[in-house]
């Protein structure tokens, strides 16, 4: 008895899958080269995407887009989709992490004792740098200056919490 291993896919479904992959490839063309390097694309796909950015002729752009779609068929789209979702802010876990960082910043600015608690949770953090950023942020807010240190404090907390093991 003959058993078919693969599930039958209609021609319409195959075309839709190929168009979806090509659209995903086109999303890659909108990213900077530095961001593309972070994704860890296949060398051929990376070259095709960077070449697409340099092309000005409409016909050549269409051919290159189809070539990118062809290369995408040989590539696992899941990591690329996850990376793009993270860039767009669709990643729920990443959003939850950013909210925890924001809550930590609010606590540190509101309560002077919060820094001690934060340092016990993240002993590898630079207490002096955090203390300075907190002091400068409070001074900034009192003087209604642009939130330069407010943002710097967020970035520092984000870095510390990304590298730390404890949950805040």
Swiss-Prot record:
Main localisation: cytoplasm
Presence of the UniProt keyword Cell membrane in the record: no
Spans through the membrane: none
Keyword rRNA-binding part of the UniProt annotation: yes
Gene3D superfamilies: PSPTO4464-like domains (1.10.60.30)
Matches recorded under Pfam families: DarP
InterPro entries on file: DarP, DarP_sf
Localization per Swiss-Prot or TrEMBL: Cytoplasm
SUPFAM superfamilies for this protein: PSPTO4464-like
Keyword annotations from UniProtKB, A to Z: Cytoplasm, Ribosome biogenesis, RNA-binding, rRNA-binding
Gene Ontology terms describing biological process: assembly of large subunit precursor of preribosome
Source superkingdom: Bacteria
Cellular component terms (Gene Ontology): cytoplasm
Gene Ontology MF: a single term: rRNA binding
CDD domains the record matches: YjgA-like
Role of this protein: Member of a network of 50S ribosomal subunit biogenesis factors which assembles along the 30S-50S interface, preventing incorrect 23S rRNA structures from forming. Promotes peptidyl transferase center (PTC) maturation.
Record family assignment: Belongs to the DarP family.
Protein name: Dual-action ribosomal maturation protein DarP
Organism from which the protein derives: Neisseria meningitidis serogroup B (strain ATCC BAA-335 / MC58)
Gene (UniProt): darP
């Amino acid at each position: 008895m003959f058993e078919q291993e693969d599930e039958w896919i209609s021609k319409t479904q195959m075309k839709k899958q190929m168009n979806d992959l090509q659209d995903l490839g086109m999303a890659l063309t909108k990213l900077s080269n530095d961001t593309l390097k972070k994704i860890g694309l296949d060398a051929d796909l990376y070259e095709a995407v960077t070449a697409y950015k340099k092309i000005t002729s409409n016909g050549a752009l269409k051919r290159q887009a189809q070539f990118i779609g062809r290369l995408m068929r040989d590539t696992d789209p899941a990591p690329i989709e996850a990376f793009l979702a993270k860039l767009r802010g669709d990643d729920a876990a990443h959003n939850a992490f950013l909210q925890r960082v924001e809550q930590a910043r609010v606590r540190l600015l509101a309560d002077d004792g919060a820094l001690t608690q934060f340092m016990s949770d993240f002993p590898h953090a630079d207490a002096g740098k955090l203390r300075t950023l907190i002091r400068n942020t409070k001074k900034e807010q009192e003087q209604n200056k642009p939130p330069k240190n407010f943002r710097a404090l967020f970035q520092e907390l984000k870095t510390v919490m990304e590298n730390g093991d404890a949950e805040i």
